[in-house]
């Protein structure tokens, strides 16, 4: 279950203008908000005290005292970082802090919500696959390419596609034993959802790395739920790629461990093959 800070963050777009001001003051500095009186919070948000009370009730709380209690509990549970949108008047210190804080918050949120049992089932799909196709579009396309770079090392037939037409053609000739790993921040990209349905109709399995409850999640055989609240109205997605890449690192580690120690010489040979391509370290410089 989401703590209060996570609930506020996830519902920002649902709040009316006045209540959103309250939410933004809380998210900007939750530690300070726990010390505010209702009058101080209303003043900081430039709203009335009744607006603060309505904000509390919209989150199922009886009033402001309960909000302060739940806010303190959220901070005590380790939710010290919450995402903050980059503003047009932010200076280098502010936007640097926000980007790092947003990334930390997203990684922490994803870690808490990932079910180890689902991770284990995802590793099963990867190990058992006859061939694996990594699909992504937009910002997720580079993540799909990185996955191909990781997973070819396991003696698996892998490919990565960022072209919609290629994705459809490959899905149209899928077979039982094929695995399609479809990566999408929103899970609402029509082309990717259609490809997932097409692959499953032809007997393949689909592993979705996407938002829970999204059309892509529903179209997938198995979904790794990746909660990624971020400001995408003006600025390009920032934290989504980091979380997706980290989840793929988790899956790659799971596959490596399943392969066992006998597989380590194979991985070592791949790594050692790159040694001649690098200049030696010059300890004097």
From Swiss-Prot:
The keyword DNA-binding applies. GO terms for molecular function: carbohydrate derivative binding; DNA binding; DNA-binding transcription factor activity. Residues 122-261 form the SIS domain. The keyword Repressor applies. GO terms for biological process: carbohydrate derivative metabolic process; regulation of DNA-templated transcription. Pfam families: HTH_6, SIS. Keywords: DNA-binding, Repressor, Transcription, Transcription regulation. Residues 2-78 form the HTH rpiR-type domain. Residues 38-57 bind DNA. Involved in regulation of glucose metabolism. Transcriptional repressor of the gap-1 gene and of the edd-glk-gltR-2 and zwf-pgl-eda operons. Acts by binding directly to an inverted pseudopalindromic sequence in the promoter region. This is HTH-type transcriptional regulator HexR.
